[in-house]
């Protein structure tokens, strides 16, 4: 047989489109031609495959070899096609049994010795192979992450020779499901960060509890050293473990940039904290071959932006659309790549360049403070459901070893109960309610509606802010076991508008 057809998977975001690899051997001057829009790393497969075949004691055909990667208009990159190209050459030269090739897909890079190396984006390939009712063969290096999602359809091998002997029926390859799934163990209780580590700041802890219960975006505002970063880092310890679907979605994104997933706690929600010097591609994704950014790596978890005004304004404004849609689409000349970006945004900032806007520590004028705060656009600040001031601790607080409030485990138990209520009522968490669902689940009596409208007019808030206040009020009512939203719930939600009050105060000075 001079023609062989082998199947593999490309990597396009969290999608893994099918690639059909056609290998043809013909008479003529020996050579190797690769067609089908390959990137440079794919073109280099010629040398890797030749050396791998020879070092695995196979014959490299002294013929004209033509390899077509179809569809031709699909960009291909990386070394993920090395193994299927090698299998195609062996099948076309009758060095292996090709009768069962149509039921397999292959994704792995080849070392010059014939060893298989892992590649990025294996989890999307596994999920796609499952839908196609084919079995996938990968490198042992990817076996741990494959064990998280594979369903008796993924084999792993160490060498090219192992794969050939398996296809010839001479030996068996282990299934990825045979790896001990340490991920099944619940590690959430081993989080060493606890709310009781933080002295005081009970008001901020209350806001953190509300944010965790309703998955609301949260902004901490206050001088340096008051515990803003510590508070934010405790949030993931208050959140429930991810569901299987959420964990698979997050793992699919993570596998695009890592060969090894942390399968010990793969169901724990991610916490991403990029530095304020992060560029647009680093935060939202990008590159010639688009890769996920921090917002996608934080999918189903928390994105924490410390020193918020120090980020470039255009970078922060790029978050506005993903915060609403839960996804980011990166357009290139030859493709549009979509990544998930459903994350909870938590940010911390100082109220002025010196860190203070009142008291003896303040060394800036109201005009300087306003210029500093104007680095943040109004539409971006509108995306925060809660903004709360985290003040300096009162004198004597550091020596106080008394009650520090509820532990993270106690708060987490409350959060789990409240989220169950929300899922039973609307099938989603409060933060994701749309306008119709807000009208249905956040009804107010006439007196309370008038109270809220009066407050909105006084604070000059937008319709988006109105909806966010109602959703926060709904979460507060859920925490208190109330079916109806009442004025105290609205008043507390309005109290979490520290940034609005600060801007009003500065404009009146």
Swiss-Prot record:
Domain of life: Bacteria
Keywords annotated in UniProt: ATP-binding, Competence, Nucleotide-binding
Membrane-spanning segments: none
Alphabetical list of InterPro entries matching this protein: AAA+_ATPase, CHLI-like, MCM_dom, Mg_chelat-rel, Mg_chelat-rel_C, Mg_chelatse_chII-like_cat_dom, P-loop_NTPase, Ribosomal_Su5_D2-typ_SF
SUPFAM superfamilies (alphabetical): P-loop containing nucleoside triphosphate hydrolases, Ribosomal protein S5 domain 2-like
Pfam families xref list: ChlI, Mg_chelatase, Mg_chelatase_C
One example of a Gene Ontology biological process annotation: establishment of competence for transformation
PANTHER family, A to Z: COMPETENCE PROTEIN COMM (PTHR32039:SF7), MAGNESIUM-CHELATASE SUBUNIT CHLI (PTHR32039)
Record protein name field: Competence protein ComM
Task performed by this protein: Induced during competence development. Not needed for DNA uptake. May be involved in a recombination step.
Taxonomic lineage of the native organism: Bacteria, Pseudomonadati, Pseudomonadota, Gammaproteobacteria, Pasteurellales
GO molecular function: ATP binding; ATP hydrolysis activity; DNA binding
The species this protein was found in: Haemophilus influenzae (strain ATCC 51907 / DSM 11121 / KW20 / Rd)
Family membership noted in the UniProt record: Belongs to the Mg-chelatase subunits D/I family. ComM subfamily.
Gene3D superfamilies: 3.30.230.10, P-loop containing nucleotide triphosphate hydrolases
Binding, ATP: 222-229
């Amino acid at each position: 047989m001079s023609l062989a057809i082998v199947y593999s998977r490309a990597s396009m975001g969290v999608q893994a489109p099918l690639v059909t690899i056609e290998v043809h051997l013909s008479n003529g001057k020996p050579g190797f031609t690769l067609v089908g829009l390959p990137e440079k790393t794919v073109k280099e497969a010629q040398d890797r495959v030749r050396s791998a075949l020879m070092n695995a004691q196979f014959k490299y055909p002294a013929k004209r070899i033509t390899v077509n990667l179809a569809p031709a208009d699909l960009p291909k990159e990386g070394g993920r096609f090395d193994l299927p190209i090698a299998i195609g050459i062996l099948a076309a030269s009758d060095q292996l049994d090709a009768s069962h090739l149509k039921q397999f897909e292959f994704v792995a890079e080849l070392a010059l010795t014939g060893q298989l190396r892992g590649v990025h984006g294996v989890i999307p390939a596994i999920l796609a192979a499952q839908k196609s009712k084919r079995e996938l063969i990968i490198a042992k290096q990817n076996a741990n992450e494959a064990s998280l999602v594979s369903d008796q359809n993924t084999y792993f091998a160490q060498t090219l020779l192992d794969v050939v002997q398996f296809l010839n029926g001479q030996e068996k390859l282990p299934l990825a499901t045979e790896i001990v799934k340490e991920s099944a163990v619940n590690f959430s209780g081993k989080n060493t960060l606890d709310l009781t580590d933080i002295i005081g700041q009970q008001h901020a802890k209350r806001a953190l509890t509300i944010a965790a219960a309703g998955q609301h975006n949260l902004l901490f505002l206050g001088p340096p050293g008051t515990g803003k970063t510590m508070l934010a880092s405790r949030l993931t310890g208050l959140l429930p473990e991810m569901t299987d679907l959420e964990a698979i979605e997050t793992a699919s994104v993570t596998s695009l940039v890592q060969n090894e997933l942390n399968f010990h706690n793969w169901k724990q929600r991610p916490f991403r904290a990029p530095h304020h010097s992060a560029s647009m591609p680093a935060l939202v994704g990008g590159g010639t071959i688009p890769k996920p950014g921090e917002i996608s790596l934080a999918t189903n978890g928390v994105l924490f932006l410390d020193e918020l005004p120090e980020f470039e304004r255009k970078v922060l404004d790029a978050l506005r659309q993903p915060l609403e849609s839960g996804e980011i689409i990166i357009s290139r000349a030859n493709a549009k790549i979509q990544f998930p970006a459903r994350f909870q945004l938590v940010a911390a900032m100082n109220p002025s360049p010196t860190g203070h806007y009142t008291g003896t520590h303040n060394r800036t004028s109201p005009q300087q403070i306003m210029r500093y705060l104007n680095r943040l656009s109004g539409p971006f600040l509108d995306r925060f459901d809660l903004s709360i001031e985290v003040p300096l601790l009162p004198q004597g607080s550091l020596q106080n070893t008394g009650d520090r409030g509820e532990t993270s485990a106690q708060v987490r138990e409350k959060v789990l109960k409240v989220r169950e209520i929300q899922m039973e009522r609307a099938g989603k968490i409060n933060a994701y309610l749309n306008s119709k669902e807000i009208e249905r689940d956040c009804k107010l009596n006439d007196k309370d509606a008038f109270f809220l409208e009066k407050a909105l007019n006084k604070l000059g808030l937008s319709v988006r802010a109105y909806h966010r206040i109602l959703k926060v009020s709904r979460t507060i009512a859920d925490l208190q076991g109330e079916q109806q939203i009442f004025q105290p719930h609205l008043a507390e939600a309005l109290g979490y508008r520290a940034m609005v009050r600060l801007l009003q105060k500065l404009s009146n000075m």
